[in-house]
């Protein structure tokens, strides 16, 4: 059964498959609220194509990241792999409950998800129990937790997305990865165009949303010179130096019309996950990633516009 799961998952796009026995999770973990009879959590990780990030790295094409690395992965590729595995398991008589991210549903009352439009998020939905995805990924042996609260894998660094299947089948466990990739260099923190990550790796979701969507004009080739006219702290916003609140974040996001959203409420990422790119470049330069390429990801000094253009 275990080998068949791995085979089907990889045939349908998964790159890494891991298994966590139920006893790795606290008795109050959400997985047992979702499915009390859970015996194993199956983790599936999928690479995000390195080439998709190159357009943002070069400042030449942005839509491919949002549509191909986020939307199609979350809405098509990953669910298909989950369903194929789950259908095989249920054909064998086991329960298989796929778990994907609820991009527009959250238990918190005043948080947000940078990847989707803030006004498309349904907040305070505590009845919809959700897994701790990063914690489950680590327990499934998919990778380790990086400083900026991102999964790091030996093959692809932070360039992965992942999902799970809960099952009552008892399957042999995958070893938990001993942390060895993240050296707390802080490059992810420094790379954020909106200073949304503190020195301990904690991410402010509203700060992240504003600059994920492109409020930093020095890293946004689509921003007009009259952007945010009339707003207090306009230059600080464009320079990535403004500290936003949930209220001011909403006002800023309402004025970001530089690029159209994708379907399913996914917002176009103008920052391109700068934190992840900086992390990947660092890991590649250290030579610790097992997936090798013929040329380095970063080929030249990072580009940046002059803030004086907006003054």
Feature locations, PLM:
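Non-catalytic, usually N-terminal nucleic-acid engagement modules in DNA/RNA processing proteins
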Residues: 1-83
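Feature captures the RNA virus RNA-dependent RNA polymerase
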Residues: 13, 94, 309-311
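Flexible loop/turn segments at secondary-structure boundaries
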Residues: 26-27, 199, 286
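Residue-level signal for secondary-structure boundary sites
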Residues: 50-52, 173, 287
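Catalytic cores of enzyme domains
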Residues: 73-281, 291-300
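C-terminal non-catalytic accessory extensions
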Residues: 285-311
């Amino acid at each position: 059964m275990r080998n068949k799961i791995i085979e089907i998952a990889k045939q349908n796009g998964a790159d890494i498959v891991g298994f966590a026995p139920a006893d790795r999770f606290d008795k109050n973990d959400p997985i047992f609220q979702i499915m009390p009879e859970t015996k194993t959590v199956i983790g599936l990780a999928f690479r995000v194509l390195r080439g998709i990030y190159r357009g943002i790295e070069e400042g030449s094409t942005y839509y491919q990241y949002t549509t191909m690395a986020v939307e199609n992965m979350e809405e098509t590729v990953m669910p298909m792999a989950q369903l194929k595995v789950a259908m095989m398991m249920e054909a064998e008589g086991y329960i298989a409950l796929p778990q994907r991210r609820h991009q527009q549903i959250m238990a918190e009352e005043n948080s947000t998800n940078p990847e989707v439009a803030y006004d498309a998020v349904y907040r305070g939905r505590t009845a919809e129990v959700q897994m701790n995805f990063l914690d489950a990924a680590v327990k499934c042996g998919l990778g380790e937790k990086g400083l900026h609260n991102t999964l790091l894998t030996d093959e692809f660094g932070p360039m992965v997305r992942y999902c799970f299947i809960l099952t009552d089948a008892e399957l042999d466990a995958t070893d938990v990865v001993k942390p060895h990739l993240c050296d707390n260099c802080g490059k992810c923190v420094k790379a954020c165009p909106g200073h949304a990550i503190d020195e301990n790796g904690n991410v402010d979701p509203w700060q992240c949303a504003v600059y994920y969507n492109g409020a930093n004009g020095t890293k946004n080739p689509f921003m007009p010179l009259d952007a945010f006219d009339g707003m207090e702290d306009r230059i600080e916003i464009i320079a990535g130096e403004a500290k936003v609140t949930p209220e001011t974040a909403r006002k800023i996001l309402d004025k970001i019309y530089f690029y159209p959203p994708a379907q399913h409420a996914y917002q176009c990422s103008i920052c391109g996950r700068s934190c992840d790119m900086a992390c990947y470049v660092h890991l590649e330069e250290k030579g610790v990633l097992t997936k090798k390429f013929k040329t380095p990801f970063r080929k030249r000094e990072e580009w940046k516009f002059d803030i004086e253009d907006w003054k």
